[in-house]
């Protein structure tokens, strides 16, 4: 076959498969995956080296990391979540891509990649920014979720319209095979529209508003797309065999529950468990659910939850203004 024929054949293949070819190789893409961007301090316990950085400066930090680059880091607060998300991938279907976003340089970041290799985590893509904010790479990778220990980085990602959370220290580890993720509702899955009414007018005004708007779907919040991506993976399995289980854990109670249920129905998104707690502390309920991770917009709720499960603060909405 001549060169012209080979070019035509490649064009036919690209047309049939939706892939572009360059020199006979398919062009890599993340478009069909759930993309999780995670900082090195969320994935591993870097508390000792971070203390050196804050107390002694960047030069001492760089020396420490290089001197200890063969020492394996202990798992961090989001390690179990990442491990379980990567476990969703199958030989015939790669659902999840995890991206490392680190303020290390590539040189000092070698210890992180040595630890990734040690634990057998399938993470091959990374951005090392040498002290600069990592959040600018969240859109570039098409991330559905960004987890970091840096609140300002998280806020920037949220401002750009991406699901993001500041991880809290936690010793909780759920070693079951099933991935269990819990979400607060207002300002997380949903917008903070209803929360603003509560903050300005109190519980009675909030209840009146939600009863009157019960059949009006709530606008989406920053975690809607991430929840939808999880639901898309769930839809590949029979309900009783899904490797993912989700829960809505909200301070709402009746009658404010109806609008939430109808909103999820309009979105065609399945939530496996819904806990309407009417203001009760969420920690024990999250422990009972067995959450691998919980997302909430109110810091006090996250601090309480972190005593029982791994948790992240979503600094978004009226409660964080």
Question: Where are each of the predicted segments found?
Answer:
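Leucine-biased recognition of intrinsically disordered, low-complexity hydrophobic segments
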Residues: 8-9
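Short linear motifs in low-complexity or flexible loops
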Residues: 14-17
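Asp-based, Mg2+/Mn2+-dependent phosphohydrolase catalytic module
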Residues: 25-34, 153-212, 224-225, 283, ...
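Alpha-helical substrate-recognition element adjacent to the catalytic core
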Residues: 26-132, 175, 184-276
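A cross-kingdom feature marking solvent-exposed beta-strand/loop segments within repeated
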Residues: 66, 96, 108-155, 165-171, ...
């Amino acid at each position: 076959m001549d060169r012209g024929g080979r070019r035509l054949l490649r064009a036919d293949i690209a047309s049939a498969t939706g892939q572009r070819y360059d020199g006979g190789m398919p062009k890599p893409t993340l478009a069909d995956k759930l993309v999780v961007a995670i900082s090195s301090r969320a994935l591993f316990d870097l508390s000792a080296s971070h203390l050196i950085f804050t107390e002694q400066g960047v030069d001492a930090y760089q020396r420490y990391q290089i001197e200890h680059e063969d020492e394996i880091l202990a798992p961090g607060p989001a390690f179990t979540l990442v491990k379980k998300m990567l476990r969703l991938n199958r030989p015939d279907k790669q659902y999840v891509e995890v991206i490392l976003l680190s303020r290390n340089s590539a040189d000092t970041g070698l210890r992180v990649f040595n630890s990734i290799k040690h634990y057998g985590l399938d993470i091959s893509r990374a951005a090392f920014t040498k002290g600069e904010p990592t959040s600018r790479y969240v859109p570039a990778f098409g991330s559905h979720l960004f987890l970091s220990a840096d609140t300002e980085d998280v806020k920037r990602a949220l401002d750009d319209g991406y699901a993001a959370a500041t991880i809290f220290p936690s010793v909780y580890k759920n070693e079951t095979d099933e991935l269990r993720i819990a979400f607060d509702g207002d300002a997380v899955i949903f917008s903070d529209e209803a929360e603003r009414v509560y903050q300005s007018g109190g519980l009675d005004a909030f209840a009146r508003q939600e009863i009157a708007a019960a059949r009006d779907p709530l606008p989406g919040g920053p975690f809607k797309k991430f929840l939808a991506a999880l639901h898309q993976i769930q839809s590949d399995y029979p309900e009783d065999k899904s490797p993912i289980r989700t829960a809505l854990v909200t301070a709402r109670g009746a009658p404010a529950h109806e609008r939430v249920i109808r909103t999820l129905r309009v979105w065609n998104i399945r939530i496996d468990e819904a806990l309407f707690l009417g203001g009760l502390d969420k920690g024990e309920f999250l422990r009972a659910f067995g959450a691998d991770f919980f997302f909430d917009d109110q810091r006090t709720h996250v601090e309480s939850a972190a005593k029982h499960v791994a948790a992240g603060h979503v600094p978004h909405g009226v409660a964080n203004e």
